[in-house]
C-alpha cells in the first residue's frame, strides 16, 4: 500500500512528534508499505525517511550500499512505485526542484519524482497515494490536507485523510471543522473525508482497514 504522508519540515518542534513519527515510519517499512512524501531531509520529513530506512534494514528487506543508500535485494513494486503488505516497499519523494537545488532532498529515497511547484507536488502526492496520513505540520501541511479533502468532496477521488493526533496536535483543527459543520459550510460531514487517529494503534488499524 502507498501511504501518503503530510508533515512538518521544521526541526525545532516537540520531541514527541519525532518519536511518534519514527515509530510510524518503521512500522510502514516493516509491514511492506511504501511511503509517498515531500522528500525533504528536515523536520518530520527527514525523520520519517530515516525511520523508514532503518525499518527496512531491520526487516532485512534491503542491503546498504557503499554510500549509505538503499540497495534493494529484489525488484521494486509495480513500476517501482507500489508497495503492499508482504512486499518490498519504496520511499517515494515528490521533490520540488527548488528544494533539491537548496540541498534539502533526502538521500534515503528509493524513488525520486521531481516537480516544478507545490501545486504539482500535491497532485503527484495524491496520485501515488492510496491513503494519506497528516502528521503535525504547519501551513504547507494544512494546504495539503484541505486540497485533498476538497477534491474528495466534489468527487475527484475517494482517498481518506487520517489526522494522526499526536499530543492533541489536531484538536484545534477538529474544533474548527466541527464549527464549520454546525454552520452548514461543509458538504456532507467532514468525517466522510477525514478520520482522526488518537493513538498509534488507531492509526495502524485505520490504515489496515483501507488496504
Segments the model singles out, each with a brief description of its role:
Residues 1-77, 83-128, 164-211:
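A cross-family phosphate/adenosyl-ligand binding-site feature
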Residues 36, 132-138, 160-165:
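Glycine-rich anion-binding loop/nest that anchors nucleotide
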Residues 119-153:
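Active-site/ligand-binding-proximal alpha/beta "capping" segment
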Residues 151-159, 185-186:
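Arginine/glycine-rich "motif VI" loop of SF2 helicases in the C-terminal RecA-like domain
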Amino acid at each position: 500500500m502507498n501511504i501518503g504522508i503530510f508533515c512538518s519540515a521544521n526541526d525545532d518542534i516537540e520531541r514527541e512528534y519525532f518519536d511518534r513519527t519514527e515509530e510510524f515510519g518503521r512500522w510502514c517499512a516493516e509491514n511492506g508499505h511504501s511511503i509517498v512524501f515531500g522528500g525533504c531531509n528536515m523536520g518530520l520529513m527527514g525523520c520519517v525517511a530515516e525511520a523508514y530506512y532503518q525499518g527496512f534494514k531491520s526487516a532485512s528487506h534491503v542491503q546498504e550500499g557503499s554510500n549509505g543508500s538503499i540497495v534493494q535485494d529484489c525488484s521494486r513494486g509495480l513500476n517501482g512505485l507500489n508497495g503492499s503488505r508482504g512486499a518490498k516497499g519504496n520511499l517515494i519523494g515528490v521533490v520540488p526542484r527548488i528544494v533539491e537545488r537548496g540541498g534539502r532532498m533526502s538521500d534515503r529515497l528509493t524513488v525520486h519524482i521531481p516537480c516544478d511547484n507545490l501545486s504539482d507536488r500535491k497532485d503527484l502526492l495524491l496520485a501515488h497515494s492510496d491513503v494519506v496520513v497528516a502528521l503535525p505540520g504547519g501551513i504547507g501541511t494544512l494546504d495539503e490536507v484541505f486540497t485533498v479533502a476538497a477534491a474528495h468532496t466534489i468527487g475527484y477521488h475517494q482517498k481518506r485523510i487520517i489526522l494522526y493526533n499526536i499530543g492533541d496536535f489536531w484538536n484545534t483543527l477538529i474544533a474548527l471543522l466541527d464549527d464549520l459543520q454546525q454552520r452548514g459550510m461543509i458538504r456532507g460531514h467532514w468525517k466522510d473525508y477525514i478520520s482522526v487517529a488518537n493513538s498509534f494503534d488507531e492509526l495502524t488499524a485505520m490504515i489496515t482497514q483501507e488496504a
